[in-house]
Amino acid sequence: MEIPNPPTSKCITYWKRKVKSEYMRLRQLKRLQANMGAKALYVANFAKVQEKTQILNEEWKKLRVQPVQSMKPVCGHPFLKKCTIESIFPGFASQHMLMRSLNTVALVPIMYSWSPLQQNFMVEDETVLCNIPYMGDEVKEEDETFIEELINNYDGKVHGEEEMIPGSVLISDAVFLELVDALNQYSDEEEEGHNDTSDGKQDDSKEDLPVTRKRKRHAIEGNKKSSKKQFPNDMIFSAIASMFPENGVPDDMKERYRELTEMSDPNALPPQCTPNIDGPNAKSVQREQSLHSFHTLFCRRCFKYDCFLHPFHATPNVYKRKNKEIKIEPEPCGTDCFLLLEGAKEYAMLHNPRSKCSGRRRRRHHIVSASCSNASASAVAETKEGDSDRDTGNDWASSSSEANSRCQTPTKQKASPAPPQLCVVEAPSEPVEWTGAEESLFRVFHGTYFNNFCSIARLLGTKTCKQVFQFAVKESLILKLPTDELMNPSQKKKRKHRLWAAHCRKIQLKKDNSSTQVYNYQPCDHPDRPCDSTCPCIMTQNFCEKFCQCNPDCQNRFPGCRCKTQCNTKQCPCYLAVRECDPDLCLTCGASEHWDCKVVSCKNCSIQRGLKKHLLLAPSDVAGWGTFIKESVQKNEFISEYCGELISQDEADRRGKVYDKYMSSFLFNLNNDFVVDATRKGNKIRFANHSVNPNCYAKVVMVNGDHRIGIFAKRAIQAGEELFLDYRYSQADALKYVGIERETDVL
């Protein structure tokens, strides 16, 4: 009689039952382990408390209780009551005192906890309701209806109730591994059952085979199975995905299992991971691999690593900066300088911007190479220098550090063959050992400094510039030049400032006439075509900023201002466009100067410099807490920035319903995409109350590509005054929220 085979792997229903049973078993096991751990901790802590209590009791027994000296009875007063103070200790005598009542102390206004911030902090949307809001001890019918509507806004997802909803459980990594391994055992047993059945049939049909051979074959197969762990069947991941759809598709789960099992090895490095350059296992790798983590985590808009304000980092800036910062010095830096080698100084001077001469004169060039002999080192070649050489011949030698700091990938380079009739020579190289870390650092520095070997040697610190020069020749990097299209862009024609101002006014008027909607700025990335109707900046009616990858001559790119005054009138293009002066664009108004002091000629750069006033927090005369200013300010002067969490409009709608129920909201619209919420995180300006006659006003300003909310003085404010804003309530909300001020106005 044949034993019935278990369900095959094709039966998805069988695997679903197994997934459910194993998951329930693992959950029960986790709960049991958690309970046992909690009990063990409770017993251990209770024993420590008992031990400490016993020690304190022994110490207190050694102390003698001394009674307090009794006070003399006070003479009677006709308006004060007399009270008697008795003690439970026998050593203390009763005392008779006159009872004096204290004056009423005003209660401190209610304040909910919040975290201080000095700049906006972007957070993700909360798709699960973290807790049911508390609406008071008395539950009303309208409160129950509100809670039901609130849960529906989160699609019925409440923290702690995920297990009640089928398929909404997010499995942790540890439980996921245990679940797959447990299901994999059923798969192994199933295959073993099939193999045993087939082997039994084959053994019955082949009785002539000796028993020893069959045992040997089974032993070999068993050793192979035990030595190599089989990867789980695809049906297992499909069953888990069908039971828990919130965890992803089967392919995602398979990749997740593979990553978790590979990470179990403590000595194994993550994929595409380069060893620490300062460690003993440093390797010699290319520049792209060395800078991969820096380019991935670095934000080129705020110049920070792992930025919390820009989730989508700007693409690399491939355009070169005009001003040169790094130049090759024509004189040797020391006795071991590479410029002392024969022909090296002429080569360095060839690419030095200071050695340029005007006119069409002929010049002798000496290029160092390994293909020519020492005798030919003094050979010269005459090359004709044209007008194009005057413009682009030496730009690449003095590269800018900023051009590479904003570049996500290293500057593209191409191997430039040696010009004809140029003879080069290489000095006899000394055997110098280079470690993997030094070679990797050289490749990183060479992408920025190119053939400035003196600067590279100073940065390395372990090699002379002569040794660096010889290694560069060996690496064949000495003739690698940046691509012409990146390092030699077309010359930009000069335009008069009045044309740029007219251009800015035209776009601003277009924005004012079309709509009042403000959209979040995202840099455009289409370097091969101009900005047209498909450009995201044009579509959102934003200017192209310095972070965009369009052509520098783009008509939509904001040019900055050329003001000589304070930039606080509409004559300034930046002020007209409701944006602060950019220190990289506005070079004459003072926005790019005096960063170490608060006194600056430009008055349109206060938010980015953080030139806020000193604010005080105290109980308000209107409602709750209020914000007071410590120093006097003039009209239209910057007071503070309204900071908080940067959330989406959908998240603001969900939070706003709860805030409206509490009759306290700190939401502030930033643009059509984001809202600033200062409820959980913010600064002291969040306590500024509403008034129909405010002394401050808020304005959304574009600051270096980011919309930020600035609070400015609407009139001259004296020190110690409370700050008020116009929340722009509707007529019904104004009667509900500002009753104190309304009664004051009537009186």
Curated annotation (Swiss-Prot):
The reply to whether Methyltransferase figures as a keyword in the UniProt entry is yes
Q: A Pfam family name for this chain?
A: SET
Cellular localisation: Nucleus
Q: Which GO terms describe its molecular function?
A: chromatin binding; histone H3K27 trimethyltransferase activity
Q: Does the keyword Transcription apply?
A: yes
Where is the sequence biased in composition, kind Basic and acidic residues?
Answer: 194-211, 382-393
Primary location group: nucleus
Enzyme Commission number(s) of this protein? 2.1.1.356
EC category name: transferase
- Bias regions of kind Polar residues — which residues? 395-414
**How is this protein annotated for GO cellular component?**
ESC/E(Z) complex
Q: Name one GO biological process term.
A: heterochromatin formation
Q: Domain CXC, which positions?
A: 504-606
Q: Which reaction does it catalyse?
A: L-lysyl(27)-[histone H3] + 3 S-adenosyl-L-methionine = N(6),N(6),N(6)-trimethyl-L-lysyl(27)-[histone H3] + 3 S-adenosyl-L-homocysteine + 3 H(+)
Which family, according to UniProt? Belongs to the class V-like SAM-binding methyltransferase superfamily. Histone-lysine methyltransferase family. EZ subfamily.
Q: What does this protein do?
A: Polycomb group (PcG) protein. Catalytic subunit of the PRC2/EED-EZH1 complex, which methylates 'Lys-27' of histone H3, leading to transcriptional repression of the affected target gene. Able to mono-, di- and trimethylate 'Lys-27' of histone H3 to form H3K27me1, H3K27me2 and H3K27me3, respectively. Required for embryonic stem cell derivation and self-renewal, suggesting that it is involved in safeguarding embryonic stem cell identity.
- State the protein's name: Histone-lysine N-methyltransferase EZH1
Gene that produces this protein: EZH1
